[in-house]
Amino acid sequence: GLHSWKAMDAYIFPDMEKMYRPELMKDLTKAADILVNAINDKIKIRVIGDYDVDGVMSSYILYRGIRMLGGEVSCRIPHRVKDGYGIRDYMVDEAADDGVGLIITCDNGISALGAAKRAKELDIKYILTDHHEVPDKDGVESIPVADAVVDPKQKACTYPYNMLCGAGVVYKLMSYIFEGKNDKSYINELLPFAAAATVCDVVPLADENRIIVSNGLKILNDTAHLKNTGMRKMIELLELSEHIKSGSLGFRIGPCINAAGRLDDASLGLKMLMTEDEKEAVKLANELITLNEERKELTAQATDDAITQIEETNALERPVLVVYLKDCHESVAGIVAGRIREKYYRPAYILTDGEKGLKGSGRSIPGYHMQQALQNCQ
């Protein structure tokens, strides 16, 4: 609810001037100084993101922003199956082999203690940006030792709003740097990608997130003047020009970006955003759209198989549903678990064969803490 005139005004008139000052976020100015110095010193920079929409958009915001500042930057997006989630120690070794002097994580890293330690051992500067909860044991946070840790969910961070997505966090970082250079055009160019990630990562569309999405949509709907070739071609192929709403991001554009991370390689989506060649942009956008259609078919089949198994066994006698689907693609297990939870309104796990043993995903209902329940089984 809205409990003050100020909150009501921000909700009705979500103007960019009402965004909080970036420097209020812990370590953000420190991260900005490290990044700008690395660019000025011609140090190679490596961005390490994630394979979902937020991870791809976060990576692009950093990549594009650093390129606009004249920096030398490359990106590494983990493969869902081969690498798993988040930065790994060997990714730091890869960066060292490539002569990288600064690593920046986005939408991941807050739980990767080993990677931060490895970077320090190799004398690589390490900026951690994330938006996930900080691992906590008995009330004590376990935070990686990095040159800068930018995560609004840290207890020591007093930023007024801690529900930004990963792209929202790096957007604040880049906007702070560009403000210092008095160039708002670059800030506006990056905004639509923070907006897309905000919707697709399903963070609350309130407070600062609402401002990001509202203003990002205005830029996206001016398709003819949209600077990003890949995003413009995706919008045209999906026939969304000048009719883009938050639902368009969440249910049309987002799933196409996500499909690459689920069925192929998430770097496809990033390549589409990076390219300035119109023919390549169309080719990549079409690939993503095709992958999403395939993902829909796989999800529908796996959901039908799960329902059949539940209905034909005594599964509904148990308060928690656990379903093993041999032929389910592991990348759609979470979507299927969500649909099973919705149908039967009880916690659901979908398991399938992984490279080593079983892999799966779970979706819960209010009042049932899945992580705690799993820990109790150990």
Question: What does each of the following model-derived ranges do?
Answer:
Residues 1-102, 122, 179-378:
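Hydrophobic helix-and-loop "lid/oligomerization" segment in the mid-to-C-terminal part
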